[in-house]
């Protein structure tokens, strides 16, 4: 409960999602702000989002160009591993590209994005007024604050600590670069968490609608036959509305989510190479250099936590929500058996089942990649296989360097 000490008691879905959407807005990755416990689109919010993106790009590459102009920085880069430098350059390029895609796509779909929350709020109002449902916004808000607070703290500490360690006389520039890098990479990360939270919200409502469809509850709560039939129709319409919301989420997040997932998958494999491949060479330097290498690898491991968590956990939430949606539809199929005296329900059930066959609704990202547990298995196998290949490559590279050193030593010994 201490987590919610500084936050007002959530009463609507806007209050529940406010914390995570504020973070997304501060990163410039949505086009609506928060005013009086609701979300609104204005020219000010649009201008702010674009200004944050432009400022982050300018400061990021401006500070980088100034740093690269320093002689000592160029000397340190000349001594660095070429593959690590290539990976770092690729990470910077992909991160800025993904951030730009995320900002532009969510600006374009800002009204549809806002419409998802408005439709969800309207559905919640019907659940509370007609069925007396308790949606437990407090629990959801507490979870968002705890998870994102921990992940954000770890991410900021890792990036800024690494910047301070490598600063060596250019601390202000490195910290500015680290701040801009945090915004550029954090925006897509928070967007992924928002998508994950929306999927979880829909799953909670699907489970609630399953309880409302139980004949025991309907007979106890609505004994009048005409009221009971009205409530059944309302529940069925809300189930269909939640399915439409899944389709709307897919449209809004298609491009930004696909770009972020491609970036996370590509960079996770590369960062794993740096972690495990470079650790092979630790121990061959002096004690001070070894300590510095271990600290940098530790910072890198912490930076990997947010993208890996999002990459592997988000499909699980999506898959579970689809599972709950299918359970709702199976309960709707049984309405004919539970209420045989209500012949007017038969056309409703038949139309919904026909719509279900045609729709085949799933959570997807761009290129129609279905977000499910199969995707988690695919991502995990890719990461493991790449890890093994990269470790083998790193060990081969180190072995080649050792052979070259032995060759040079032998040539010096025989006098060549």
Swiss-Prot record:
Q: Which domain of life is it from?
A: Eukaryota
Which terms in the Gene Ontology molecular function aspect does this entry carry? ligand-gated monoatomic ion channel activity; taste receptor activity
User: Extracellular side of the membrane: what ranges?
Assistant: 35-48, 105-143, 193-295, 396-416
Localization per record: Cell membrane
- Sorted alphabetically, which InterPro entries does this protein's record hold? 7TM_chemorcpt (IPR013604)
Q: In which tissues is it expressed?
A: In larvae, is expressed in neurons of the terminal external chemosensory organ as well as in the dorsal pharyngeal sense organ.
Please report the record's description of how this protein sits within the membrane.
Multi-pass membrane protein
- One Pfam assignment: 7tm_7
The portions of this protein that span the membrane are 14-34, 49-69, 84-104, 144-164, 172-192, 296-316, 375-395
Specify the glycosylation sites in chain numbering.
Answer: 290
* Cellular-component GO terms for this entry: axon; dendrite; membrane; neuronal cell body; plasma membrane
| Alphabetized UniProt keyword annotations | Cell membrane, Glycoprotein, Membrane, Receptor, Transducer, Transmembrane, Transmembrane helix
Key word Cell membrane present: yes
Question: Biological process GO annotation list?
Answer: chemosensory behavior; male courtship behavior; monoatomic ion transmembrane transport; sensory perception of taste; signal transduction
Give residue spans on the Cytoplasmic membrane side: 1-13, 70-83, 165-171, 317-374
Family statement: Belongs to the insect chemoreceptor superfamily. Gustatory receptor (GR) family. Gr57a subfamily.
Q: What does this protein do?
A: Probable gustatory receptor which mediates acceptance or avoidance behavior, depending on its substrates.
Q: What is this protein called?
A: Putative gustatory receptor 57a
This protein's species is Drosophila melanogaster (Fruit fly)
């Amino acid at each position: 409960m201490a987590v919610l000490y500084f936050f007002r008691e959530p009463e609507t879905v806007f209050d529940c999602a406010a914390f995570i959407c504020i973070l997304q807005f501060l990163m410039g990755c949505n086009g609506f702000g928060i005013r009086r416990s609701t979300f609104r689109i204005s020219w000010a919010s649009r201008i702010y989002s674009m200004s944050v993106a432009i400022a982050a790009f300018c400061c990021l590459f401006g500070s980088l160009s100034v740093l690269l102009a320093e002689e000592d920085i160029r000397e340190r880069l000349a001594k660095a591993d070429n593959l690590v430098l290539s990976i770092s350059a690729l990470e910077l390029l992909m991160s800025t590209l993904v951030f730009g895609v995320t900002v532009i796509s969510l600006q374009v779909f800002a009204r549809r994005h806002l419409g998802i929350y408005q439709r969800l709020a309207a559905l919640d109002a019907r659940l509370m007024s007609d069925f007396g449902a308790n949606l437990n916004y407090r629990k959801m808000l507490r979870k968002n604050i705890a998870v994102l607070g921990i992940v954000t703290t770890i991410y900021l500490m890792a990036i800024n600590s690494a910047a301070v360690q490598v600063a060596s006389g250019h601390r202000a520039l490195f910290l500015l670069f680290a701040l801009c890098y945090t915004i550029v990479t954090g925006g897509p990360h928070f967007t992924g968490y928002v998508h994950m939270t929306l999927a979880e919200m829909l799953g909670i409502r699907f489970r609630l609608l399953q309880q409302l469809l139980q004949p025991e509850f309907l007979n106890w709560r609505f004994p009048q036959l005409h009221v009971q039939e009205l409530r059944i129709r309302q529940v069925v319409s809300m189930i269909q509305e939640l399915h439409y919301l899944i389709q709307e989420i897919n449209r809004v997040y298609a491009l930004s989510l696909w770009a972020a997932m491609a970036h996370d998958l590509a960079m996770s494999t590369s960062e794993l190479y740096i972690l495990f491949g470079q650790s092979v060479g630790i121990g061959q330097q002096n004690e001070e250099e070894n300590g510095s290498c271990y600290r940098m690898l530790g910072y890198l491991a912490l930076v990997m936590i947010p993208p890996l968590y999002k990459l592997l956990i988000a499909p699980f939430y999506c898959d579970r929500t689809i599972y709950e949606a299918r359970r709702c539809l199976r309960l709707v199929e049984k309405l004919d058996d539970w209420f045989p005296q209500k012949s007017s329900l038969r056309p409703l059930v038949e139309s919904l089942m026909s719509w279900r066959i045609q729709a085949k609704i799933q959570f997807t990202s761009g290129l129609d990649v279905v977000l499910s547990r199969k995707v988690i298995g695919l991502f995990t196998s890719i990461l493991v296989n790449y890890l093994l290949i990269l470790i083998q490559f790193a060990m081969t590279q180190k072995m080649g360097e050792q052979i070259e050193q032995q060759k040079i030593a032998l040539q010096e010994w025989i006098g060549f």
